[in-house]
């Protein structure tokens, strides 16, 4: 997959937050990944009440899903991140996770504050759209 990030100087510097303003992708297979949360392989929450731990676990789960689809995190064109309102005042853990998992050519990303997710212990959920060759 070919992916090219565009970050016009007329838009704010989103790279400091770990995402690109625009991503143009070319490939032949589209991968849609359901929202990933901080569950381990047994369905147990990782990092209850801890946005940092939950963010990193959700991103690890996303990486696992991409491998299962035959791709890598580098193939992700866009992310949609849902953050519970109670945790949205300090989003540094989310930024830190994005910078750690997408250090180069990060995907386009939308952050959405929500009143709650599927379970009360979830603070973040991340869904992805990728393009593979």
Residue ranges and their predicted role:
Residues 1-60, 64-77, 84-133:
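N-terminal presequence-like segments and the immediate start of the first folded domain
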């Amino acid at each position: 997959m070919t992916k090219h990030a565009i970050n016009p100087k007329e838009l704010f510097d989103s790279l400091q937050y770990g995402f690109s303003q625009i991503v143009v992708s070319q490939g032949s297979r589209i991968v849609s990944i359901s929202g990933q949360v901080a569950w381990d392989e047994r369905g147990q929450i990782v990092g209850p009440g801890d946005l940092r731990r939950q963010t990193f676990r959700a991103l690890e789960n996303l990486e696992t899903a991409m491998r299962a689809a035959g791709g890598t995190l580098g193939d992700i064109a866009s992310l949609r991140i849902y953050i519970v309102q109670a945790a949205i005042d300090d989003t540094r853990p989310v930024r830190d996770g994005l910078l750690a998992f997408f250090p180069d050519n990060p995907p386009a990303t939308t952050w959405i504050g929500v009143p709650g997710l599927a379970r009360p212990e979830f603070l973040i959920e991340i869904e992805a759209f990728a393009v593979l060759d």
